[in-house]
């Protein structure tokens, strides 16, 4: 029915009860915030002296900017590698060749089950023992390896689910046109699957950015680690963490906004140009009028 709803509209008593619950929740929230503010103010964490260091260029140059640079570098490289690895593994799991499908399935399930931190630590010590990278890049390589392997496995499942969600008629039509499985996957299925699953991919890319902070365990210079060092150096842990939180929220919001814009652009490009409007049909009377009104 056009006017149906999923639940009954609340009556007068239900509206009053909902209003009371909302008011009590708001009051309790304000009280909790006031208690937190009072405790921080009593400890002197909200004084102007605690925030003044963030107005100096030396603090940003020494602590914050190197952390931002490390976080963005690790996230950018990991995102590119994870997308490539995830797409390859996702397509492999859909392969008609059984050994390829089994190997890709084992790889995906294995790296999905491992914690990111364990993979970072393992890669860090492996690279250190084998002298794979210079010592100054060991932590970065370990972070990128852990983020790439874990998120690549997750993205593989996203790609596989996106392809499986498409109508079977897509593949059948491609087969009728004589396209091979690889051509069908590359030209028809993957573009549609990635576009339809783009919101989920965006969420996973934000996870990549946030998980880069785990790298502080292997001495990776990232923004959260640098924030704690600011707190230790200036004795302003709370202001430092607040600033770092604002920076991370801003970067994540920018990434989400960019991905949303890209999604809209991709959807608009798939629609193609607007259809041309047909001219008004010429009637027999029009010909007659043009020839003096008679035929």
For every predicted segment, state its role.
Residues 1-295:
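Transmembrane alpha-helices and adjacent helix-loop boundaries
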């Amino acid at each position: 029915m056009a006017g149906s709803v999923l639940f009954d509209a609340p009556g007068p008593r239900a509206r009053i009860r909902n209003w009371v619950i909302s008011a009590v929740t708001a009051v309790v929230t304000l009280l909790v915030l006031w208690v937190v503010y009072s405790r921080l103010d009593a400890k002197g964490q909200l004084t102007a002296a605690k925030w003044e260091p963030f107005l100096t260029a030396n603090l940003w140059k020494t602590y914050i900017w190197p952390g931002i640079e490390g976080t963005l570098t690790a996230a950018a490289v990991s995102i590119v590698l994870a997308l490539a690895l995830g797409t390859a593994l996702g397509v492999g799991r859909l392969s008609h060749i059984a050994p390829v499908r089994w190997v890709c399935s084992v790889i995906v399930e294995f790296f999905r089950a491992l914690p990111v931190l364990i993979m970072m630590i393992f890669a860090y010590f492996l690279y250190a023992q084998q002298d794979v990278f210079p010592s100054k890049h060991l932590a970065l390589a370990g972070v990128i390896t852990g983020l790439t392997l874990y998120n690549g496995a997750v993205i593989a499942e996203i790609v596989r689910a996106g392809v499986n969600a498409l109508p079977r008629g897509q593949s059948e039509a491609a087969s009728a046109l004589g396209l091979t499985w690889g051509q069908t996957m590359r030209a028809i299925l993957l573009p549609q699957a990635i576009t339809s699953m783009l919101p989920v991919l965006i969420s996973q890319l934000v996870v990549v950015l946030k998980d880069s902070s785990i790298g502080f365990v292997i001495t990776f210079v990232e923004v959260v680690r640098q924030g704690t060092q600011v707190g230790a150096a200036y004795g302003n842990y709370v202001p430092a963490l607040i600033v770092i939180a604002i920076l991370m929220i801003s970067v994540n919001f920018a990434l989400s906004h960019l991905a949303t814009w890209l999604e809209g652009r991709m959807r608009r490009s798939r629609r193609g140009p607007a259809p041309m409007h047909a001219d008004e049909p010429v009637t027999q009377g029009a010909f007659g009028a043009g020839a003096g009104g008679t035929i």
